[in-house]
Amino acid sequence: DYVKIHPFSYGTESKFYSGGDHVTFCTVKGIPVSPLICYDLRFPEIFQACSYQSHLITVIANWPTPRRCHWISLLQARAIENQCYIAGINRCGSGGGLDYSGDSMVIDPYGKIIARAKEGQYLVTAEIDDNIVTQYRKEFPLKADRKPLLYSQLYQCRK
C-alpha cells in the first residue's frame, strides 16, 4: 500500500512516477514500523511524521557508492532526530553504470550502528528493543519541543 513519497527528480524518476501522498504503518512482532523508500531519506519531515507512531523506520534504497557517506550519515541523523531505530537496506553490486556498496545497517535511537553488513551482499540481523525507544522518549521528550505550526508557517512564507 505504500508509495514512495519523493520520486528522485535528479534521476528522472519524477518524469515517470508520481509521488505518494501518505505513509503506511504496520506492526512486526509488536513493534510499530514505517517503511520508506530510498530518496525519502533526504526529507526529515516525513520521518518526523512517521515517528509519532513508529519505533522502527525502514528505508529500502538504491544508494550508489559515490553517495555512501550521505547514506550512512542521514540514517544516523534520522535515528537521532526521531529517537527510534532505523533499518537501512541498500542495494549492492552494479547496474545501470553505477556501483552500489550495500552498507545495510540497523541504527539504535541514540545513533549507534548496532548491526552492519560489510560491503556486498550480507544478511543483517539485530535485536530491536521497543522499550528502549519508549524509555528514551520519556527521559528526553524531544517531540514536546517541536513547533509544527511554526514550521508550517515558515514553509508558507517560501511560496
Mark where each language-model region is.
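C-terminal beta-strand edge segments of enzyme domains
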Residues: P7, F25, R91-K159
